[in-house]
Design a protein with these regions (language model features):
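Transmembrane helix-loop junctions in multipass membrane proteins, especially transporters and channels
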Residues: 36, 64-71, 103-109, 132-144, ...
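Interfacial "cap-and-anchor" motif at the non-cytosolic start of specific transmembrane alpha-helices
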Residues: 169, 174-219
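Hydrophobic, membrane-facing alpha-helical anchors
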Residues: 2-4, 35-41, 70, 109-115, ...
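Hydrophobic transmembrane alpha-helical segments in integral membrane proteins
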Residues: 2-25, 152
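Short aromatic-rich membrane-water interface segments that cap or initiate transmembrane helices
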Residues: 4-10, 75-87, 144-157
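Alpha-helical transmembrane segments in multipass membrane proteins, preferentially the mid-helix core
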Residues: 24-31, 94-98, 157-178
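Hydrophobic alpha-helical transmembrane segments of multi-pass membrane proteins
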Residues: 14-97, 117-134, 186-201
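Membrane-proximal helix-loop-helix units in multi-pass membrane proteins
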Residues: 89-97, 102-161
Length: 219
């Protein structure tokens, strides 16, 4: 069993995730409006924003249906929480791909590195898919349709930490190699994202990760 301190305030969840959706929609709208064509790096960055938007919506649905009893409510709870888990680790992988491409500007190199970077993502996805069959590896949904995290959630958090740490390593290692980088404060993204992940791990019901990712992407 894996449970932190539970603090669920539905109004706070709706406000934070609603703000996330608005910020991501605004970001995507502005980026598309100001560009005649999108490069691979732009598409990856937009992909992070889209995943964050979908994650915020899925989490909101998960909290709204949790504990409710109606036809299909348990299935919705399973699916929405599964999307949240996959979305979280997907952002970590996409961020590493973006950093790799931003530093070396080599699409072929990024694809080659992605073959290794995708491993934590695959582990998480396989675990989430297995969880849909009621194994309880990542989380459980009781007969009363109440969500409960289990020990497997640690895999997702560890994967994110690995992705964040690797992106920082890429930047500082490239500088040692003499790669001339323009202003690229990787910590400005990793810092808020890491803080949000830690808060959400320790205090279930505080929805901080999506909105902090949104802030990091915009600023």
């Amino acid at each position: 069993m894996m449970e932190g301190i539970t603090i669920i305030v539905l109004e706070e969840i709706l406000m934070a995730n609603g703000l996330t959706v608005l910020m991501m929609w605004f970001l995507l709208f502005c980026r598309r409006k100001n560009r005649e064509s999108l490069h691979v790096g732009d598409k990856i960055y937009d992909g992070i924003a889209i995943v964050n938007l979908v994650g915020a919506l899925s989490e909101t649905i998960a909290f709204l249906v949790d504990g409710k009893q109606f036809t299909g409510s348990r299935q919705i709870n399973y699916i929405s929480n599964s999307i949240c888990f996959i979305g979280t680790v997907s952002m970590g992988m996409l961020w590493c791909m973006y950093v790799e491409l931003r530093i070396y500007r080599n699409y072929k190199r990024m694809v080659q590195k992605a073959g290794v970077e995708i491993f934590p993502w695959l582990v998480e996805v396989i675990m989430v898919l297995c969880n849909l069959f009621g194994t309880g590896i990542m989380f459980k949904i009781s007969g009363e349709n109440v969500y409960q995290r289990t020990a497997g959630v640690l895999v997702g958090y560890i994967s994110l930490v690995i992705y964040f740490a690797y992106s920082i390593y890429l930047v500082y290692h490239s500088k040692k190699q003499g790669v001339n980088l323009n202003f690229f404060p990787v910590i400005y993204f990793v810092g808020p994202c890491f803080a949000g992940v830690v808060l959400q791990f320790l205090f279930y019901g505080i929805t901080s990760s999506w909105v902090l990712v949104a802030v990091a992407l915009i600023f």
